[in-house]
Amino acid sequence: MKLFDLQILKSLPYRGRFRGGYMFKGGIFKFIFRIIKLLLIIFFVGSILLVLLYRFVNPPITFLMIERGFERKAAGKDWKIDKQWMDFDDISDPMKRAAVAAEDQTFLENHGFDFSAIEKAIKKNEHSKKLIGGSTITQQTAKNVFLWPGRSFVRKGFEAWFTLLIDIFWSKKRTMEVYLNVIETGDGIYGVEAASQAYFHKSASKLNNYQAASLAVIFPSPLKWSVVRPTRFLRHRRYLIMRNMRRLGPLEF
């Protein structure tokens, strides 16, 4: 380009320069920004509608159930999703108390988050290679129903959002009902009714304190821990859960 041409170019207003260059790039950035903005709006509205839907409609399946099904197929096993929905009022009171005693003793008082537990988890994460959670029952329900399996800070962010929505739009009764019906309780087994039938050959409506605590004890790791063959560690954990159940007394939902 000649020096004369460069002088003419410099004299042009900024908006008139490189219509296929700078302005085109600016248009691309605006287009990308609009797409991101649209996706955020869709996620925001869609997530609210989905949480509202599941306030009245029972979740038919979860990402974890699907993943576990494929894992079984890859291992040469049959596809298995054993789940039997049970309404809140039909689940035995000991089972509800065992869940609270084992997983979230402030469940009826907190608003989806237990900040003291989160603070402890953050301190542990500073010295751990794995992400350690301080999850409430509401957070676990958000994770189990709406999110994919795994642990990452991104997923924790989504979990926090869905936890907030559940706390806003669901009652504690509905949260506990969904939690006890979708939680993994064994290899291909989900929910306390299917687990009760598999391990105790009885309905979850008839579980006593000991059986409910035996079931709640495996909630953190249902594929590694056994209800029927508990280790010494699990037996001690079951004792602690039963002690907490007595301390909690009847729960007022």
Identify the residue ranges that each predicted region occupies.
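Juxtamembrane regions of bacterial inner-membrane/periplasmic proteins
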Residues: L3, I8, F24-F253
